[in-house]
UniProtKB/Swiss-Prot annotation:
Belongs to the CTP synthase family. Residues 1-265 are annotated as: Amidoligase domain. One of its GO terms (biological process) is 'de novo' CTP biosynthetic process. This is CTP synthase. L-glutamine binds at Y54, G353, F381, G382, M383, Q384, E404, R469. PANTHER family: CTP SYNTHASE, CTP SYNTHASE-RELATED. GO terms for cellular component: cytosol. CTPSs have evolved a hybrid strategy for distinguishing between UTP and CTP. The overlapping regions of the product feedback inhibitory and substrate sites recognize a common feature in both compounds, the triphosphate moiety. To differentiate isosteric substrate and product pyrimidine rings, an additional pocket far from the expected kinase/ligase catalytic site, specifically recognizes the cytosine and ribose portions of the product inhibitor. CTP binds at S13, D146, I147, E148, K186, T187, K188, P189, T190, Q191, K222. Transmembrane segments: none annotated.
Length: 542
């Protein structure tokens, strides 16, 4: 039977519970255990698919088409285990399912309440689908004391009593702030956070304390005494230079050993940290550096591009170079020459996005890369803008546009209304709901033999994750091919363009899918490895 590790947070939000969960999962894997990581999000949205990137950050898409929390990206990158729809649930999804059951009469006239109906639904979600696993790590979003999180805390409290003895532990991630004027770390916020947690019936087994400096013995002793945990269970989670050093840092601090001790697993098998050491060796000893411009719409919140940032770093790991990112808001290009902002960079990446704001700036970035022969990588919306720019400039159709921005007589990009998934026709209406109605998840694509994209993949059949409701119009295919831009990747039915590239350019590729979602530090995505390699070549010319 699986053992359960519940990870909660306190004092402040954005402490890194997702990263801590992922790192612990990686450490348990390194000891030979099988793990699954799951996330409970207390917000009332069904999923984060319609939430602003400025509020939620990135929407991480799974192979099975779920729009989930960005922490699932950490889980995948650290453990290599693909996440699925049922690794993430929200209060909104739970309430929707409960209300649907109530309307059907499934509760036989009972008064539907938070306890037991909501808490039972949460417990059922946590316990389902874990057969054959050694450990299930469950992260609870938000911080202890949040009103919306109370049903989740109550559910995991009940599970602590209902699971067999020795099959559930609680880890509380907290912050030890340093007060310069006092010259010391303060433990009182953590004490109050644990007091709040204990008031709802949860006694943490381990305190994982975020800090920028070593925890003195006296503070460690004080935390153990007033938080009712053993001193050895007060784990120092020191800041590190790279997130990929977190597994090693947590192992050195004794987190994985303390977790196994809390479960009574002795002696514990030694972890194999070789692949993490290999990754850090490349990060710590770069043989060069490149600068990549990210021309985006949500650059004010870097979490909106979390997987993209990590995938670029993976490309750097593969090529033994440091990747410096130059964040550029695409709107600043509109009506101006982008050259002063882009002449110094070695590669230009235009990521996904929605809506007309900043679209013209993205097209100008694509034009600059095309004309100056700078490596260009367009992803999803970025590919669409590159195609529109090519139709306007090369095919001499200045009114070319996307129907996403309004009616147009030259719809180079249009709304998808029909596509195939698993041999079934999927249909969407233009006036339908926005949530969950895009082309989501893994879809196959066929690559043209002899194309640059096929050379990069080393294959002509691939599967990648998608998140879009607009597509490039194949009616412009021949006109673009005459100008050097080819559709080098298509859906199996030949109707949906998946990849475009310029044949006479050192590296100009646009993809409709999101390759960043499948990149790993120890298995960099080939597109990002190739893009960074092209940027290295460009760095020798600039």
């Amino acid at each position: 039977m699986a053992r359960y590790i519940f990870i909660t947070g306190g004092v402040v939000s954005s402490l890194g519970k997702g990263l801590a969960s992922a790192a612990l999962g990686a450490l348990l894997q390194a000891r030979g255990y099988t793990v699954r990581l799951r996330k409970l999000d207390p917000y009332l949205n069904i999923d984060p698919g319609t939430m602003s990137p400025y509020q939620h950050g990135e929407v991480f898409v799974t192979d099975d088409g779920a729009e989930t929390d960005l922490d699932l990206g950490h889980y995948e990158r650290f453990t290599g285990r693909p996440a699925v729809r049922d690794d993430n649930i929200t209060t909104g999804r739970i309430y929707r399912d409960i209300i649907a059951k109530e309307r059907r009469g499934d509760y036989l006239g009972a008064t539907v309440q938070v306890v037991p109906h909501v808490t039972n639904a949460i417990k059922e979600f946590i316990l389902t689908g874990n057969e054959g696993l050694d450990f299930v790590l469950v992260e609870i979003g938000g911080t202890v004391g949040d009103i919306e999180g109370l049903p989740f805390f109550e559910a995991i409290r009940q599970l602590g009593n209902e699971l067999p003895r020795g099959h559930a532990i609680y880890i509380h991630l907290t912050l030890l702030p340093y007060i310069p004027s006092a010259g010391e770390l303060k433990t009182k916020p953590t004490q109050h956070s644990v007091k709040e947690l204990r008031s709802i019936g949860i006694q943490p087994h381990i305190l994982l304390c975020r800090t920028d400096r070593p925890i003195p013995f006296e503070e460690r002793r004080k935390l153990g005494l007033f938080c009712n945990v053993r001193e050895n269970a007060v784990i120092e989670a020191r800041d590190v230079s790279s997130i990929y050093d977190v597994p090693h840092a947590y192992h050195a601090a004794g987190l994985d050993q303390e977790v196994l001790s809390a479960f009574g697993i002795e002696p514990a098998p030694k972890p194999d940290m070789s692949r993490w050491k290999a990754v850090m060796e490349r990060i710590d000893n770069p043989e060069g550096e490149v600068t990549i411009a990210i021309v985006g719409k949500y650059t004010g919140l870097k979490d909106a591009y979390k997987s993209l940032i990590e995938a670029l770093s993976h490309g750097g790991i593969a090529n033994r170079v440091r990747v410096n990112l130059d964040w550029i808001e695409s709107e600043i290009f509109e009506g101006t020459d982008p050259a002063p902002h882009l002449e110094h960079v070695h590669g230009i990446l235009v990521p996904g996005g929605f809506g007309q704001r900043g679209a013209e700036g993205k097209m100008l970035a694509a034009r600059f890369a095309r004309q100056r022969k700078v490596p260009f990588f367009g992803i999803c919306f970025g590919m669409q803008m590159a195609v529109i720019e090519a139709v306007r400039s090369l095919a001499d159709i200045p009114l070319a546009n996307s129907t996403e921005f309004g009616p147009t007589n030259e719809p180079v990009v249009g709304l998808m209304t029909e596509w195939m998934r698993d041999n079934e026709l999927q249909m969407r209406a233009a006036e339908g709901d926005l949530g969950g109605t895009m082309r989501l998840g893994a879809y196959p694509a066929l690559l043209a033999a002899g194309s640059k994209i096929a050379e990069i993949y080393g294959a002509t059949e691939i599967s990648e994750r998608h998140r879009h409701r607009y597509e490039v119009n194949t009616a412009y295919r021949e006109q673009l091919a005459e100008k050097g831009m080819i559709f080098s990747g298509l859906s199996p039915d030949g109707l949906l363009p998946e990849v475009v590239e310029f044949q006479d350019h050192p590296w100009f590729i646009g993809v409709q899918y999101h390759p960043e979602l499948k990149s790993r530090p120890f298995a960099p995505h080939p597109l990002f490895s190739s893009f960074i390699a092209a940027a290295m070549e460009q760095s020798r010319l600039v």
